[in-house]
């Protein structure tokens, strides 16, 4: 099927697929390895990986050590499959238990095992072996792996993940200790005096892992009974996810580098080691925050689980102190946000507002906070890989042309703008990877770079850069003024609303006084009318000749 699809794409002797089939590795090493060779969007690297062709990869590297850059070894086809996915499919279909080729792709070529395909599959590490093509016996070797789809994690793989994380943490802590001792022996001794050693860090990690079942049981009951606030960490699979993320973070820093970066491995180890405590503390905070919000007092029981036992899981004073501080910080941040919002919306009348008005303000602020995640004005997510490649272009320009950093940055921006002007579609941020491919062609050698710069009008580029900066500043100023105007209008509306309320009360009081006055006048007039009628009635009872009228008798007034 693959051969049929490639017929329409491979009609040249210099085509990557033909070069590969003819084993012309010298020419293939300097060809475009990202070129599609079939209708499924596969590249020749996909085919080599599917064939588990270790020799082909090695032969290409001999002719061009930088042939398999990150965007080459991690090019996706139409189903979002990377070459490493194709290699994994071959291994699984053949039942081959030896996955050394996958280790080679990750550790030797920089394949990223954490990128999911269209089916959501990633490459996970579960069984330890050892492989590092640049230093097979070194202490910084990445543990080898048996690779399974991420949805195939079971109880056994959880245990293996736990063991793997503990080993990784110990290796990283040891590397960090060695680096600190080289940089500052005094600092290293100070840490040891405080009990910060690879052994203590490893024991702390084991303590967390050993308590996982109890923590899972606790949060499983919390979710089932719907007690208190729903935590961000619920259910029994969260320790699996945490361990997978930590392992992936470790393997990404290890495996996401090309062969030329192997000498810098200790630097990345040191980075991970420095952030290890932060990762573990954040993990502890999630649980401790939930204990505080759902457990109540320390001796309060939830079902058959005592929260005092949970709170005693981490007995180290420093850990408890960090957890308490982190809880206060987390809660304080939320409280500060609410207070700040309430102050902005009701700054002139905090003491006069009733509870219902505050509730309305709180709901409005909650809605605004939720809209932060769906607003189209929020900044786009940064592509860190693209940013790294952009930064690497500066060094490459400096090396090829021998210019300083500022000039190199100007040349890089000029080439980037020129490519965008020639192809407006490449200006869009979602096409950054395509733009990088075009730029890499220019940076291939000194001659191609110099030719590209000679065709660019630098004065025009500088003018355009200045114009873009001015437009960007103008947009920011307009947005700022718009926000200020909206806030001013809201304050004015609230002020008018309060004024209308006061006027309404005053009007009601005046109306009430007027009504009472009118009622009093009406009462007086009615009484007067009654008296008048009484007088009239008395006069009407005097008949002709001064006789008083009665119902039955007429009495004369004369003597």
Swiss-Prot record:
Residues 348-357 have a biased composition (Acidic residues). Gene3D superfamilies: Ankyrin repeat-containing domain (1.25.40.20). Residues 433-495 form a coiled coil. It comes from the Viruses. Residues 320-329 have a biased composition (Polar residues). InterPro entries: Ankyrin_rpt-contain_sf. Keywords: Coiled coil, Virion. It is found in: Virion. Residues 315-360, 454-559 are annotated as: Disordered. Its main location: virion. GO terms for cellular component: virion component. Residues 454-501 have a biased composition (Basic and acidic residues). The keyword Coiled coil applies. Residues 507-527 have a biased composition (Low complexity). This is Uncharacterized protein L488. It comes from Acanthamoeba polyphaga mimivirus.
